[in-house]
């Protein structure tokens, strides 16, 4: 499966956000990852539809939106209107997951489902064929710059095995504590979409993105 880098703008410098986004695109990052937090599902508060809509007007990158909010079905239409291409919701935050997935698909967006580190991967079994992407959190969601949880590798492997057994080539995205030094491990475990915040935006953005792209070429 094609390996894709999704720089997380939560780690960007918002004073020069447009410039930094262009740097990621110029070096080959096809996605942009947006962590939307409501201060309830997770402790932090980040940004919402206006930021997404503003960025949408300046890039052709895939808008990959991760909703870390309670009862996310309330926001599906608003994020679609703001320009989201992929809308990922948390299994733990949805009262009726099927209804949420149906609403996302009806809007024309791709639907992702995310799980926290403490949620059993097996809990995704009923919706393996319903989602377009699964996002495995490799840190506790809500804050950037945390250390990668090593047990995440087995969780990625288990999910890829579950998908393979059903003949599904569904994307597995991973987020949290991923750097050039450990990205091969998550790819080897079965992930193909890599969210990176600090690893992209700290230091030379061009050099960092190029580093990920060079590793991805090893898997072509």
Where are these regions (language model features)?
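Conserved N-terminal beta1-alpha1 strand-loop-helix module at the mouth
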Residues: 1-88, 94-96, 103, 110-111, ...
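Non-catalytic terminal and connector segments of soluble metabolic enzymes
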Residues: 15-19, 163-167, 172-173, 186
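Short, electropositive alpha-helical surface patch
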Residues: 84-92, 187-195
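Short beta->alpha connector loops at strand-helix junctions that form conserved
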Residues: 90-92, 116, 137-140, 197-198
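Structural preference for solvent-exposed beta-strand-turn elements
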Residues: 104-106, 168
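Glycine-rich beta-strand-to-loop/alpha-helix junction loops that act as flexible
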Residues: 172-177, 195-199
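Acidic, divalent-metal-coordinating active-site segment for phosphoryl/phosphodiester hydrolysis
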Residues: 177-189
């Amino acid at each position: 499966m094609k390996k894709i880098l999704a720089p997380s703008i939560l780690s960007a410098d918002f004073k020069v956000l447009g410039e930094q986004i262009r740097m990621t695109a110029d070096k080959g990052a096809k996605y942009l990852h947006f962590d939307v937090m409501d201060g309830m599902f997770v402790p932090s508060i980040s940004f919402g539809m206006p930021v997404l809509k503003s960025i949408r007007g300046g890039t052709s990158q895939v808008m990959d939106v991760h909703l870390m909010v309670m009862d996310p079905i309330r926001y599906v239409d608003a994020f679609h209107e703001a320009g989201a291409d992929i809308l990922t919701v948390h299994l733990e935050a949805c009262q009726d997951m099927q209804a949420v997935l149906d609403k996302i698909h009806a809007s024309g967006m791709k639907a992702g489902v995310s799980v926290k580190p403490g949620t059993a991967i097996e809990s995704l079994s009923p919706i393996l064929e319903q989602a377009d992407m699964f996002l495995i959190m490799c840190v506790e969601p809500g804050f950037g710059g945390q250390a990668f949880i090593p047990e995440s590798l087995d969780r990625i492997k288990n999910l890829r095995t579950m998908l393979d057994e059903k003949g599904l080539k569904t994307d597995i995205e991973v987020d949290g504590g991923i750097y050039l030094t450990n990205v091969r491990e998550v790819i080897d475990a079965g992930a193909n979409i890599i969210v990176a915040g600090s690893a992209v935006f700290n230091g030379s953005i061009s050099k960092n993105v190029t580093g990920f792209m060079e590793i991805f070429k090893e898997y072509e």
